[in-house]
């Protein structure tokens, strides 16, 4: 077993694109995370119906964005949609080492082979291999594993790799 445990608090929000841009813009005005959090909650800038949803999403987004440099946050605000998506993907990979390793070991290999279909079996093989060294993965729920894939209308056991949105 390894001493470095994976952070497994994934959300079903994907990249949380719009919310992340809002948080980055708010942060860029004051450059203080505590003030950013208070302002977003007080003004309901994430436009959630329930405050607990705002707090949960905000906590997740702040963890991710704190991994970016000042220049990265500025590019997130002012960059193209493609640059923004890449930065949000980078922020997710920095926050979730398991996701970064998955991208490196599975997605990269599939891309090199021009295999653009992601299957549940691909995820299962990856998770099984990693659980040998990370006992925290032995108790991971099926829902967390499914965040790596989403059913395709053509084949319930296969999905397309995410487009980055």
Task: Name the predicted role of every residue range.
Residues 129-145:
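Short, positively charged loop/turn segments that connect secondary-structure elements
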Residues 155, 159-164:
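Positively charged, low-complexity/disordered segments
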Residues 20, 99-100, 120:
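Short, leucine-enriched amphipathic alpha-helices that occur as contiguous helical runs
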Residues 1-86:
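Eukaryotic partner-binding/assembly regions in large regulatory complexes
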Residues 119-133:
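DNA-recognition alpha helix
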Residues 88, 95-115:
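Positively charged, polyanion-binding regions of nucleic-acid-associated proteins
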Residues 148-155:
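Conserved small/polar residues in nucleotide/adenosyl-binding loops
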Residues 112-119, 144:
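Short basic-aromatic helix/loop recognition motifs at nucleic-acid
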